[in-house]
């Protein structure tokens, strides 16, 4: 395959001797070409017919990229060869990453995962059902008479973030500071390194954790800080690293997914009408939107030399496993760029795969379904503001920078 240079040669790492030149495809996960067409469209170039299932990019220090769903799933499942010890790219970010349990492999990971499940599992989500519903309705109703909003700022951020802050027992006035730090970890703007953002997050968490070890409540941080792993109390360091992960997950992923989904619905009145006329399809629509607008791309590190699908990988190589590419793989989903709410089999790895399947998926799905139902009930007809240029940002968690929406208040419905 002809080498495609997407990033300037000045930023390209030397090609390791074990990497064949025909597998080189210089894709920059933080600045892909054609990003203006949409972040998923920009990543879909990795699945064009002339691109191998496994490629090497010299961008961001140099790493492998699995481009097909089968390889992505196999690597997620095979933690003996593909370790979570260094899950972020570039390497310096991955080496600084020490959140628990996502930086661990089985069996060590399992006890911590069981503790995390106590704070974000289905029973917790069920208890939050009324609060989720109330907050969604309140936010949408406050926007409805205005006829316009920046959906990202006015709904996609405050809705899931306020739910998480409630779950964690943290004050809402801390949201701007925490959101800035999590953004620097997943879509950095250059103002902080990953390590600096992580340490700032830990500086915030340490006194809170110590306070709740002394006076525990029923919130997520108290449960983690006073939890048991492997038959012993969790240490302060372990609690800090677990709570750090909860904050990063709670303040970033659903925020961005909601904006991607609403951008699509704003441009597609026929899909909106389908859900208005057939609200029972909303759960299926949620799953199809999760497939089409998946947004996470994390990685693994090779624990030993290993031949994978005919390609020789070396110990210490990093491999990017873009979760979005499973759902966009035409080998798994026919016409993958097309959104079909009646799709019979929806295949994706939006919440990961294998031992690190996202524990927050139940809360995420609930928040998405409630948003679709309550928004379309109140504001059925809306569009992108005239002249607005929607910008996406690519990274470990991709996002929509701003989403200006408009509608005629006369067509809305107070509920």
UniProtKB/Swiss-Prot annotation:
Swiss-Prot/TrEMBL cofactor(s): heme
GO biological process: (+)-camphor catabolic process
Enzyme nomenclature, EC number: 1.14.15.1
Gene Ontology molecular function: any one: camphor 5-monooxygenase activity
Residues binding heme: 358
Pathway entry: Terpene metabolism; (R)-camphor degradation
DNA-binding found in the keyword field: no
Keywords, alphabetical: Cytoplasm, Heme, Iron, Metal-binding, Monooxygenase, Oxidoreductase
Reactions catalysed: 2 reduced [2Fe-2S]-[putidaredoxin] + (1R,4R)-camphor + O2 + 2 H(+) = (1R,4R,5R)-5-hydroxycamphor + 2 oxidized [2Fe-2S]-[putidaredoxin] + H2O
InterPro entries: Cyt_P450 (IPR001128), Cyt_P450_B (IPR002397), Cyt_P450_CS (IPR017972), Cyt_P450_sf (IPR036396)
Cellular component terms (Gene Ontology): cytoplasm
Cytoplasm is among the record's keywords: yes
Similarity section: Belongs to the cytochrome P450 family.
Described purpose of this protein according to its UniProt entry: Involved in a camphor oxidation system.
Name of the protein described by the UniProt record: Camphor 5-monooxygenase
Species annotation: Pseudomonas putida (Arthrobacter siderocapsulatus)
